[in-house]
Swiss-Prot record:
It comes from Arabidopsis thaliana (Mouse-ear cress). This is Zinc finger CCCH domain-containing protein 49. A zinc finger (C3H1-type) spans 120-146, 155-177. Residues 225-235 have a biased composition (Polar residues). Keywords: DNA-binding, Metal-binding, Repeat, Zinc, Zinc-finger. Pfam families: zf-CCCH, zf-CCCH_AtC3H23. Residues 209-235 are annotated as: Disordered. InterPro entries: Unkempt-like, Znf_CCCH. One of its GO terms (molecular function) is DNA-binding transcription factor activity. GO terms for cellular component: plasma membrane.
Amino acid sequence: MMIGETRRTYPTVEIPPWPVLEELTTSEFFSPVMNSPDCSMLEALAGLQRYLPSNEPDPESYPDLLGPDSPIDAYSCDHFRMYDFKVRRCARGRSHDWTECPYAHPGEKARRRDPRKYHYSGTACPDFRKGGCKKGDSCEFAHGVFECWLHPARYRTQPCKDGGNCLRKICFFAHSPDQLRFLHTRSPDRVDSFDVSSPIRARAFQLSISPVSGSPPMSPRADSESSPMTQSLSRSLGSCSINDVVPSFRNLQFNSVKSFPRNNPLFGFGSPRGSILGPGFQSLPTTPTRPGNLDIWEYGLEEEPVMERVVESGRELREKMREKLHKENCMDRVAQDPDQNLGEAPDVGWVSDLLM
């Protein structure tokens, strides 16, 4: 104790401060309208803010939101990935991790050229792989992995092999049918253009990730789904309409069926039980078929010249068949009916009718 200081009989009591969440502003405490309805409403709102749930999603409750394509990430949209990712220069002044930044930095290997400004394809440049390209930014090929796979002609045009289990920060492939991109070569005002929400997108995604089998478990419908043949035609024909191609294609195949011989193994497809048009136009047969898709264009082009040669050489073929049957009868290889006349010649008229 200091000299002259009185002894205190009671200890000092420390009063804790008010919590910040429960404090109101000073103007509200000393306001002359403290007991007004507006003041009581502010007090009620201040008390409810601690118990009301937040509008922002909880990443712990929804682990899918933490993925590379989560809606929380503003840089995961297709437009930003194709045209702005590692293209736009970074505006940060301080040092930071370049791999975590979506923008381009001086001297960075992942830097991309703007595909809207520089006209280059999605094919990798062979000279750049060897060590350096002399053309530089004027090269018509892609320099690096990011320019190759983030190019608008290749980005998310193929499904990801990992699907929903992909953990890559930047994935160049599609993880769902909605993410699969189709390259539109036709004008947007056409009525028969592909719809983003149509079943063709989901069907194409399933066909691209599923192995090729002999017969599918169920017959696809022509009005709701597209066959692989129709999809290949749509990609090869470009701006031509599928609705215009199908009628002409049917007429072509109908004429080809007429010219097929009855001993052809494909003749059963032209019967009422099946059709040579394939699974995209009617139901598939229930009997097992050979694996793989039937390339009708290729088969038709191969068979027609053979049939022409057969028709041209029909007389020679008939003579050979008559000679062969005559030799077999002479060598007693053909079993004869006891009631049949031995001098009667075999009936080969059906061969002539077949080849006429």
